[in-house]
Amino acid sequence: SKHNVMPSGTIEWGTLRKNFLEGKTAIMWHSTGNLTTVKKNAKFDFGVAMLPESKRRGTPTGGGNFYIFKQSSDEEKKASMRLIKFMTSPEQAAHWSMATGYMGVSPSSYQTEALRNYVKDFPPAVVARDQLNYATAELSTFQTGRVRKLLDDAIQSALTGNESPKQALEKAQKSAERLLRRYQ
């Protein structure tokens, strides 16, 4: 970097929270699922903000989806639905949000007394929820993991100066098209 305030290259996602808590990085862009851990372990004041904007706001979504597989037995499907209903109930969603930092999964979770009191005492807990007003669809396609890795690798290549952004993205686009050709 121009001012030598951070290591060259990119910072690994898996070590970012640790680096933040150890004061090795001043800002992190990470999952809301880290919020409670940061709150419990930071030995300094910190804030939470919406993602910056240029011409318009936007935020990715993603997270803990629930799936019921079609080949599951009827008994497994019923048990799965009981679990999903339990986990998404307002009280449980509120508890999960406070325990982890993830957002409550429904507006009703924010109406529970527990979560209302929590966000009153800890306003950063509603930043991600409020940012949903600007949410965009999650990148989801066939071979999502592989396509996302191509994009991540292109961004890293551009950030480290190995390729220009245009070169890196054109290369990723060609690779993604090759990967997805059989699905067209």
PLM regions: where:
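Short amphipathic alpha-helical coupling segments at ligand-binding clamshell hinges
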Residues: D74-M87, Q92-W96, A168
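Bilobed periplasmic-binding protein-like "clamshell/Venus-flytrap" ligand-binding domains
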Residues: S89-T100, L179-Q184
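Long, aromatic- and glycine/proline-rich binding clefts that accommodate carbohydrate-like moieties
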Residues: A49, M98-L150, S157, R182
